[in-house]
Every structure is written in structure tokens, then in C-alpha cells.
Amino acid sequence: MRVSLSSLQRFFSSPLSIKQIIEACDHIGIETEIETLLSSSFSSIITAKIIQTLPHPNADKLVVATLFDGKQEHQVVCGAPNCRPDIIVPLALPGAKLHDHEGNPYTIKKSKLRGIESQGMCCGADELGFSHLQKTERGLFEFPANTPLGESACALLADTWIEFSLTPNLGHCASLLGLAREIAHVTHVDLILPQEFSFSPLEIITKDSPSHDTSICPFFCCVKISGVCAETSPQELQQALSQFKQKSINTIVDITNYIMLAMGQPLHVYDAKTVDIDSLHAEKAQEQHGLKLLNNEEVLIPQGTAIICDKNHTVGLAGVMGSGDSSFNETTTDIILEAAYFLPKAIRASQMRIPLHSEAAYRFTRGTDPDHVLPSLYAAIHYIQKLFPKAKVAPIHVLGSIPPSPTLTLRTEMVERVLGVPLSHSQVHEELASLGFTVTPQDQGSLSVQVPAYRHDIREEIDLVEEMCRTQPWKIEKKKAPATYSPLYAFKREIVDFLAQSGLQQFFTCDLLDMETAALHRQETDYIALQGSKHATVLRDSLLPGLLKSTATNLNRQAPYVHAFELGTIYTKKNAQYQETQSLGIILSGEAEELSWVFHERVLSFYSIKGWLERLFRHFYISSKTYTIRPSEHPSFHPYQQADLYLHKHLLGRFGTLHPQLCKKAHIKHPVFFAELSVDSLLHTQKKAIARYQPYPIYPSSFRDITLTVDESVPADALRKKLLSFPSKWLENVSIISIYQNKNPTAQNKNVSLRLVFQNKERTLSNQEIEEEHERLLAMLNEQLDDTKGTIDS
């Protein structure tokens, strides 16, 4: 949300510096960016009042204007359609430097236009670089009538804009009033409401409509106003909108937009000729039907979608956008003005069905203030009456009522336990009261806290504690640790740090899956009982579905590769009991690395994902002797490119190449390699692993290569580990050199080549010693290979 500093200052009892505002936003968790429009780029442009206009004797479309700057008069030839006496405009004197529409600089000089001398130029907003200040049409920029004469025009127009990046939980800040409320609390200044937003109540008629659905819209108001038109907004209103960098459209639309941006309450305008106000209400669509919207887009509204309608037809998609047929237009003279409080979940459901976005929907989905529905409507009505004095306002129709605010119980002991700071009962009471909560003391160290209607993010006791910490973080001086040390948390943190530093991106996916995503991993699913949405009905029992969906999204948006991991909770069923476990998922797809002149193109393979697991194990000092790799038969993986990983004979996880049909189902064209490990089991093993210092060898090593012909079912790594398990003083390492498999489909054997490294750390081994040790190991291995009918070539 982008607003000007000057508009924000109007809500404070005393002015705040830009530094104070930025620091306050940092404390309450709102990101800010500053954009300053400087007046130094223009010179010799002052404010002047047109005191007389005369027709140009030699040109029908030009006038000769006389302007007064408070000290002297200036004669200027002007062709603007709104050049008339008694308005204050920007006057560029000779020597002033401006820019044309293409950005090219030029200098104002004294000149003659059709034989009449012109001592400068009257300027429009676009010529000053402030085109956002007025509607896009040729004409002079008009200052308010009380603007001082002879002042720098650019200095009066220049302002500082602040871009506020709001997180979804801060919907109550999506307005000038909301932002000012938060900043005022942190900076300890009083919040004031400008005069244009403070009005006395108007006549109300409370109605009862059996068709109105309060589960969508608990509070609905509308009013008929006669005698208006779609004329150009006065400069004052255009300038007010410009403080949000909003373009002017027409008077009525500008008023509703300004009220929404300033107070956070969206309003909607209907043409009264097309809408029956007596039957106007909100309901769920009874059947699927089409609707042409304000943006000329035709949509199909599914059954059950929240709509606004009268007894004749649908007039809008509730909380999102109105219909084009009932919209305010150039011929409208009578309007119906609507203000309502829609439940956020109802509008979110509509946007799920129809992916439309609007400023109104942005606010309704995050939650608006039901207490501001009528005040915002009053403000809009009075603004309309100010611009259209002859307009007639009928009584306001009201359906439903304002829902009560939730009341929570807060224990002082809870605050101290979470924050780690000793706080008295009165301190907690005072802090919450200053935040706008209604606090009532209770017995036994607890408080009854009524949440303000605009705070949709406060629903539980812990939210109140978080709010205290968020708004006054500098008061929280840690006197003691708020929680005990968690080995699992520290271990997870180390895994994240290692994998992220090694080049993998961390993904975060939702624990709850929709049916389509869950089906990527399993066919039979258990659905949760209390479903908040049809898009979140299944608890995941693996990280695979979420990671696979995220991978598809990134690759389909032209990402060259996805090398990512996720550390999260999965939910499994064992002996009819559900349990939560921590799981680590690693997924690779696309290119192996970014192409450059240094690296040749390399493709990912089964061994790429295996390599990542080995790097992780080395980081935690888990020896290869402690884990084994065995063939597996999981349906999600390629039948011949998958394996189970066992650690101390306990299943740790599995890895491999995902099944091509699964990749096709997920709309991924590249092979996908995936691994998933139990973090709980990994932590248990890591506790036993000890890093031991190994001095660098000073004596040379020797090696011997052997080739084993074994049954194709024998894992090559099993041979390597078998050799390492034999008692030997000098066998330092065994590595796999190559594996050869006969292309003949009837062949049952394969050749595995191994390299045995021998070394004595205290002296150089003789060739005879190495040969004797080598022969001894081969003899032992021959005995082990009897069952496999393998042979050995050394």
C-alpha cells in the first residue's frame, strides 16, 4: 500500500519525522520503502492567481491571461480549456526549465504568440511531472483557493511516498487510519480523525429479509441518493486521491475510493434505475449462472458463491466486483451506495471459485472493521452532499447486525512464560488497553480481554502475547530463557543451514493437501473431520506430494532446475494410532547446474540424489559402515532405480528416481530424483556419531584392484562393506571402480571392480606384506561368495 507522508501526518496529534515512522514500522513488522519527489528538478515555477482573461485578437482558441503572484502581474497567452479568472495555477517564469511529454528538457522564454507577448507559461500537472495529481486530460493544474501566492509550486506539490508491505495478518493496516493507529501506539502520539471522516449518524431503517444470508454478510447497509452525476472531481478530491497515487475517474467513484483507502471500508455504487433497493441483499448463488462484471469480463458463477442480488437479478460478486449492467455511468443521476461487512472466509471461497482480484477483495479477504461500516457510509454521503448540494438522501437500509467481538482469557503467567520477562498484572492490563483491547481483571491472575472488531488476527490467548511482543519489542529484556533446549530443534536448524549453504533451496509446503495433490503419492487417503476448505482435506504422510507440486510449478515457469529440500511434519498411522514425525525431503530435477563456459552440460541421475545423502551423512560424521542400501519396491519410484536406506538395521528412508508415470501425472517433463529420511531416526544415530581427528598420513599407501563376478542380485556396496568388515590391520579403504552388466538378457551375472587401499600409518609397507594381506582377504571373501557362486579375478 502506497501513501504520502503528508496524508499520514493528518492522523497524528503532533507531526512525526520520516525516520520515526520507518522505525515504528520496523518494530511492528511492516516493511517500508521510501520514494521522495523532489522539487529541485524544476525552478522558477511559482503560484499565481488569474485575475483576468481576454480573448486573443488573432486566435480563437487562445486567451490572454493576467496573473498576479502577490507582488506583480504577468501577461501569459494560454490555450488551456480551464483557464479562467479566480483560480490559482503554477506559473513558469522565463528561465524556468521543464520537460516535454517525451522527457526532453526545454527552457521557458519570453515570446510572442500570434503577435501578443507572453511572459511565461501556465502549467498542467503533467508538465511538472505530477501527472498522477489530476485526471488525464489537457488543462491547468488548480491549487486550492487558500494557497499562498508567489510560493514555489513544486515545493507545494512535492511529497514523500511510503510503500508499506503488509503481511496477510495485518489486514487492519490496509488503510490510512489502520496504519496511523499502529504507528501512533508505538510512537506514543495521539491518534486523531480528520474532520472529513467525523459525521453525526443519519436516519436508519432496520429491515428483515428472509433471503439475506448472514453467514456471508452479517451486516449490510445501502442508501439511495438522488441528484448526482458523473462529473470530473474537484481538484481537492483529485489531490486527496493523488496522495495514494490513484488516478481520478469521476466524482462518485473517487469518493468511494478515497473512503476505502483512508478508512479501510470498501463501498460500491449502483445505478438506482437498474437495482431495486428494497430487495437488495447478499446470498449464495442458487444455481450456476453467468455475469458480466465491471471490467467487461464475463464469468460463470458457480452454485454456492456469495453474490449481491435483488428480486430480479444478480448485481455483483459479493465483496469482489459489481456487474457491468448495474454500474454507475455517465447517464446515472440516482445511485445506490452499498457498505457491508463480509466474512473473510466467504470472500476467499469466492476467489477460489473465480480468480478475480480487486482492492475491495484484498481488504475483505483479510477482514474489515464491522464498526466502520456505517461511519464510512456517513462520510461518503456527506462528501457527496458537499459536492452536490441539491442531492437527496433517503434513509439508510440495514440488514443484519454487527457481530460481537470475541473475548479471550489471558493468564499473566502465560505472558511471563512465553516472553521470559516478569510482568505484573497491571503492566499486562495497561499494555493491552493501550493497544485498543477492552480489559477486565479476573481472579487468580487472569484477564478477560475483548478483542477490537478490526483485529481478525487475534483469536487465541497466544495471539495476545505475540501482540504485546510485536508492538513493544524493545521492552522485552530477556531475564531467562523462555523455553528449554530442544535437541531436535537444534538438529533441524543444523540440517537446514548445511543444505542451504550447500546450494539447495528450502521449500515450505502445507501440511494439508487437496485430493488431487495427495493422489500423487497414495491412492487411499484419510480425510480430516473438520475441513476448513476443500483444498485442504488430507494430512500428508510424505513430503513428496507438496515438493512435487512445487517443483512442477517452478519448472513450468521456465526455472532451469529445481534443487530443493523441505524439513517438515508428516502424519502416519501405526497400529490404528496416528503419529507425527519429522521428515526431510530432497528433490532434484531439471539441469544439474547452470551452464557456463567453465562447466560442460551434466545431467542429473540416481547417483546425484545418493550423493546428497552421502554429503549429509559425512557432515554429521555418520560412517558408511553404519548404513546399508537395499533394493525396494515402492510404487512412487522407478522399479529399477530406487533403494531403501537402513541405519543400524532400522529403516531410515528411501531414495531414487520417481516413476515416469508419476512425473507425467504431475506435469513434469524432466526426470525427478527424490529422497525422504526420518529426522527423528537420523538424530538418534547422530548422537552416537563422534568426530575423530585423523592425522594426515606421512607414509605412502598402495592399492590392488580386483574384479568380482557375482549374481546380478548382489549389491555392489554389499561387497565393499563385506571387505571392510574383515579384520585387517592395513586395509584402509575399499571403493567401487566400475560395474559391468552383460547386455544379454539371459545373463545372470555382473562384474564388479573394487580397489583395495592398504596403508600403515607408522611405516611403509613392503610389497610382500601387501600381497600376503591381499591374498588373505581374497580367501576370506571367496568363502563368503560361495552362496552367490561368484568368482574372483585379482
Curated annotation (Swiss-Prot):
Belongs to the phenylalanyl-tRNA synthetase beta subunit family. Type 1 subfamily. GO terms for molecular function: ATP binding; magnesium ion binding; phenylalanine-tRNA ligase activity; tRNA binding. Mg(2+) binds at D457, D463, E466, E467. The keyword Hydrolase does not apply. Pfam families: B3_4, B5, FDX-ACB, tRNA_bind, tRNA_synthFbeta. It is an enzyme of class 6 (ligase). SMART domains: B3_4 (SM00873), B5 (SM00874), FDX-ACB (SM00896). PROSITE patterns: B5, FDX_ACB, TRBD. InterPro entries: aa-tRNA-synth_II/BPL/LPL (IPR045864), B3/B4_tRNA-bd (IPR005146), DNA-bd_dom_put_sf (IPR009061), Fdx_antiC-bd (IPR005121), Fdx_antiC-bd_sf (IPR036690), NA-bd_OB-fold (IPR012340), Phe-tRNA-ligase_IIc_bsu (IPR045060), Phe-tRNA-ligase_IIc_bsu_bact (IPR004532). Its EC number is 6.1.1.20. It catalyses: tRNA(Phe) + L-phenylalanine + ATP = L-phenylalanyl-tRNA(Phe) + AMP + diphosphate + H(+). It comes from Chlamydia abortus (strain DSM 27085 / S26/3). This is Phenylalanine--tRNA ligase beta subunit. Binds 2 magnesium ions per tetramer. Residues 697-793 form the FDX-ACB domain. Its main location: cytoplasm. It is found in: Cytoplasm. Residues 39-154 form the tRNA-binding domain. Its cofactor is Mg(2+). Tetramer of two alpha and two beta subunits. Keywords: Aminoacyl-tRNA synthetase, ATP-binding, Cytoplasm, Ligase, Magnesium, Metal-binding, Nucleotide-binding, Protein biosynthesis, RNA-binding, tRNA-binding.
